[in-house]
Amino acid sequence: MPDPEDELTPILSRAERNAYRLLLKNDLDPFEFDVAIHAGRVLDGRVTYVLQISTLDHAVSVRETGIPLEFIERSGTAGGDAFARIVDQLVPALIENMKSSRHVPETMAR
């Protein structure tokens, strides 16, 4: 019997790659950030997921919890889907947190 975790790995990896593309679309250098998606809480008998975007040294990060698997499964490279909206909503908070902590990646400092 296949392990459900193994079946989810390509889905989560694709969504992470899409998040990196969305960072680039928001004028952020994706090589300056780390994107991670992992299982979170169980709500109504279903596992939800956590999206975390942080600077490479993890000094600054933002996260969204309670993301349904369906949002992750349907994430696309062009954006415009529910997952893309979540990423787009996290970007301003990420930038604000970097500015307030004076932790600005090199590419943004130029």
Short names for language-model regions:
Residues 26-66:
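Amphipathic alpha-helical interaction modules
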